[in-house]
Amino acid sequence: DSFCMVKDDGAGIYTSTGSSNTVYYNRKIIGNIILNGVAAKFGVDVINSYLPAVGIYLDENATYVDVLNNTVANCAKTGMNVHNSRFFTVLNNTCYIKRGISDNRSCNKK
């Protein structure tokens, strides 16, 4: 409960391989409840509309990740975000959020 309170541009669950092309298999994010990604907007020299706190974030070359049956609520940015990732499965996730869903359409918006 509650994350990205001091630093932002993060997630409740975050995975990344970075700039390498190393492939990891059998990675699973299943059955989690992720709440209150608040984003550290005070004391940062950016516009207040930039609130990078995501529920689940597959970033930079994350490969072979199954994201199944998770619930995400009250995140400042989106319930789920996928950036430059490959060979992933996202099914049956529910997002209760204020600002919408990233364009992967992998959550059932409530």
Predicted regions and their residues:
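Extracellular beta-strand/beta-solenoid scaffold signature
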Residues: 7-21, 44-59, 74-78, 102-110
